[in-house]
C-alpha cells in the first residue's frame, strides 16, 4: 500500500469476522456487524502541539487495536477496505 497518513492519523485494516458460529451455524453477511478491532498498517508522524513540537504516536505498524463503532473514515485502496482514523479514536491495544 502506498499511502502515508499525515499528523496523528493511522490506517487500520479490520480483522475478518468469522462466518460460522462455534455451534456450526452460518452467519449471513446481512446479519454481521463490522468488527471493532483491526491491525495498524501505517502511522503518521504525530500530532503537533501548541508549542510547535511534534509528539509521536504511541502505536506502531502491526499493533492490534480496538476502536469505536463509528471511528474513522472508510476508504478502499488497491481493492482492500481500510479505516483512516486519528490516534484519539483508538480505545486500546490488544497485548499478546
UniProtKB/Swiss-Prot annotation:
Principal cellular location given in the protein's record: cytoplasm
Chaperone is among the record's keywords: yes
GO BP annotations, alphabetical order: chaperone cofactor-dependent protein refolding
Annotated Gene Ontology cellular component terms: cytoplasm
Pfam families the UniProt entry points to: Cpn10 (PF00166)
Example GO molecular function: unfolded protein binding
Keyword Hydrolase: no
Domain of life, per lineage: Bacteria
Localization (cell): Cytoplasm
Family matches, as CDD domains: cpn10
Keywords: Chaperone, Cytoplasm
Free-text function comment from the UniProt entry: Together with the chaperonin GroEL, plays an essential role in assisting protein folding. The GroEL-GroES system forms a nano-cage that allows encapsulation of the non-native substrate proteins and provides a physical environment optimized to promote and accelerate protein folding. GroES binds to the apical surface of the GroEL ring, thereby capping the opening of the GroEL channel.
Quaternary structure, from the entry: Heptamer of 7 subunits arranged in a ring. Interacts with the chaperonin GroEL.
Entry similarity comment: Belongs to the GroES chaperonin family.
The protein's name in its UniProt record: Co-chaperonin GroES
Originating organism: Citrifermentans bemidjiense (strain ATCC BAA-1014 / DSM 16622 / JCM 12645 / Bem) (Geobacter bemidjiensis)
Gene: groES
Amino acid at each position: 500500500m502506498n499511502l502515508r497518513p499525515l499528523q496523528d492519523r493511522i490506517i487500520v485494516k479490520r480483522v475478518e469476522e468469522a462466518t460460522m458460529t462455534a455451534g456450526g451455524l452460518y452467519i449471513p453477511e446481512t446479519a454481521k456487524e463490522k468488527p471493532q478491532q483491526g491491525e495498524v498498517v501505517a502511522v503518521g508522524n504525530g500530532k503537533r502541539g501548541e508549542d510547535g513540537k511534534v509528539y509521536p504516536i504511541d502505536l506502531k505498524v502491526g499493533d492490534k487495536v480496538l476502536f469505536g463503532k463509528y471511528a474513522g473514515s472508510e476508504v478502499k485502496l488497491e481493492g482492500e477496505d481500510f479505516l483512516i482514523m486519528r490516534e484519539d479514536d483508538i480505545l486500546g491495544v490488544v497485548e499478546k
